[in-house]
Amino acid sequence: MQVIATAGHVDHGKSTLVKALTTMEPDRWEEEKRRGLTIDLGFAWTTLPSGENVAFVDVPGHERFLGNMLAGLGPIGLGPAPVLLFVVAADEGWQAQSSDHLDAAVALGIERAVVVLSRADKADAQQRANAAAQVQRELAGTPLAQVPVVEVSAVTGEGVDKLREALDGLVGPEPDPVAAVRLWIDRSFSITGAGTVVTGTLVAGTLRPGDTLSLFQATGVREVEVRGLHSENAAIDLAQPVSRVAVNLRGIDAGTIHRGDVLTTPGKWEAARVIDVRRTTGRNLDVIPQEVVAHLGSAGVGVHVRPFDAQHARLQLPEPLPVVVGDRLILRGPGARHVLAGVEVIDVAPPELNRRGEG
């Protein structure tokens, strides 16, 4: 299975496109359906012409919900070959949140994508050409500069089959099924007769009923047991990467688990509260605010930034997180609706700083 995240400006047709590909409605909340506006993460799945299963994480496009968008994109960005479905309306062209979502994708190092010029039925030939030229200009100089572009109308069906073929062509490296599990939780809820269920994107390792896992939370780390597994609305005996998976946990209340908590293989992940990072994209680290929100996986936590220079800084996390060298984080200002910078972890156990003013 591949897991693909959507991206793009609000009201450019991301959810409508996912529904056209899967026949499933990704918007889960009544308010989303009433307003025609995606607020939180949505999920759907289908089978591509090759027979490969693919799941979609549909993210909100409105700037007010950038944090929710990053919670959907972040776990996929930590996988071996993340894939993006980047949507730009052919009748409107590139917009503000198009740039914000591109900044996030570049910060996470995403290189595999298909750009969709959506709402093709509403655009004349000149508008389509202008939108395609805009996309080329905006993607130039980024890892997504050479990705395929497909014109699609989810209303008439134009281009939908071509889009399926383009998605089928995104072949990446095989994930590691024997790696340690690190499942970033994006939902937690209770089902009558089953109990607590959490969901997330499994990008490495395998899960089986009966497994014991470590649950990283703001309050500490505790052990939990896997009672059962579901994927694509069906019970499974083995979850392998990359896949969307629902994990039924034994002996813990759903209300105590939150987005950004992490299920891991016991003893395989060190908890870090202080990490050193280097800038990969965005603003220099010596000019951003000292207090920012860092997005890693599905978590968004306030961190203190101690810059060493324009390219390097130390981040103080509010609670221990299972972070490894090479992880990519996105930084944004508290309450801000734009990405400040992307950083890569270079040390998860750095030496103490003894210079005056540290802290």
Feature roles, as predicted:
Residues 1-59:
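Conserved G1/Walker A P-loop phosphate-binding module
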Residues 3-6, 122-128, 134-137, 149, ...:
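C-terminal effector modules of nucleic-acid-centric enzymes and ribosome-associated factors
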Residues 10, 37-39, 45-50, 71-80, ...:
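Conserved catalytic network of the ASCE P-loop NTPase/AAA+ motor domain
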Residues 52-53, 59-64, 76-102, 106-129:
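Conserved Switch II/interswitch segment of TRAFAC-class P-loop GTPases
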Residues 62-63, 90-94, 110, 119-124, ...:
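Conserved nucleotide-binding/hydrolysis micro-motifs of P-loop NTPases
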